[in-house]
UniProtKB/Swiss-Prot annotation:
The gene is uppP. InterPro entries: UppP (IPR003824). Its main location: membrane. This is Undecaprenyl-diphosphatase. One of its GO terms (molecular function) is undecaprenyl-diphosphatase activity. One of its GO terms (cellular component) is plasma membrane. Its EC number is 3.6.1.27. Catalyzes the dephosphorylation of undecaprenyl diphosphate (UPP). Confers resistance to bacitracin. It comes from Geotalea daltonii (strain DSM 22248 / JCM 15807 / FRC-32) (Geobacter daltonii). Pfam families: BacA. It is a multi-pass membrane protein.
Length: 270
């Protein structure tokens, strides 16, 4: 992989991992259309690490508060307000995707990586679901109103993100909106819920990478991938959280539909 490809894929990962438009779909479809070689596990680790760094940098205050709430909540659970229980709900919401990912991620990835038409269809189908969620429901709840039940439901929805074209942030935001949370709360909880999963994915892939080693020729592309995905991931988080305070998610809906339709045309007639 050359530095140009590493830069483009790093930018794509940074933007699409955070925005509700599916990073896996873009990272499969773009190299397919441009006839680039597969990036491989080494570069996947770099991209995940970059977006993980971006999320940690943006939410560092939240993470410190969550750590404090975790130990406080353990000491006196019954008398803690709901907001202090948030770290436990994030952990509970992480379990479904962690278990399903451990059991089926490789099978699902191999199945859908060879089916770009299905990926394009999922981009469209789950765009319509996001549109429905964005226009229905009360949307009155803030993140402090999260409960164990709602955290687990959103966590179960996150399992669908293993399918390329669904989008981790897209499906968790959709689930939260359908449960009555406002857009900002849905987006913020989606990002916080993604941190353990993104970290776990990076560590899991890194463990395999350490066994094989990193070829010297891959070092520069890896560093470029980490840097670009981190920078654009940070920008994307800031952009989305500001956007949801004043407008709907329909720009992402139309984008997903457009990309899905263009991909189907290219695949079938290109």
């Amino acid at each position: 992989m050359d530095l140009f490809q590493a830069t483009i894929l790093g930018i794509v990962q940074g933007l699409t991992e955070v925005l509700p438009i599916s990073s896996s779909a873009h990272l499969i479809l773009i190299p397919t259309f441009l006839k680039w070689p597969e990036s491989g596990i080494t570069f996947d680790v770099a991209l995940h690490l970059g977006t993980f760094i971006a999320l940690c940098l943006y939410f560092w205050r939240d993470l410190i508060e969550l750590a404090s709430d975790f130990f406080t909540g353990m000491a006196d659970w019954k008398h803690q307000p709901t907001s202090r229980r948030l770290p436990f709900y994030i952990i509970a919401g992480t379990f479904p995707a962690a278990i399903v990912g451990k059991l089926f991620e490789t099978t699902i990835e191999e199945l859908f990586r060879k089916s770009p038409s299905l990926i394009a269809l999922f981009l469209i189908v789950f765009a319509l679901l996001l549109a429905f969620a964005d226009t229905s429901g009360s949307k009155k709840w803030k993140i402090e109103a999260i409960t164990l039940k709602s955290a687990i439901i959103i966590g179960l929805a996150q399992c669908l993100a293993l399918i390329p074209g669904v989008s981790r942030s897209g499906i968790t935001i959709t689930a939260a909106l359908l449960l009555g949370f406002n857009r900002e709360a849905a987006a913020r909880f989606s990002f916080l819920l993604s941190l353990p999963i993104v970290a776990g994915a990076a560590l899991f892939e890194l463990s395999g990478l350490l066994k094989t080693g990193i070829p010297p020729s891959d070092v520069a592309p890896l560093l470029i991938g980490i840097a670009t995905s981190a920078v654009f991931g940070y920008i994307s988080v800031a952009f989305l959280l500001k956007m949801v305070q004043r407008s709907s998610l329909y720009p992402f809906v139309w984008y997903r539909i457009a990309i899905g339709c263009l991909a189907l045309v290219f695949i079938n007639f290109g």
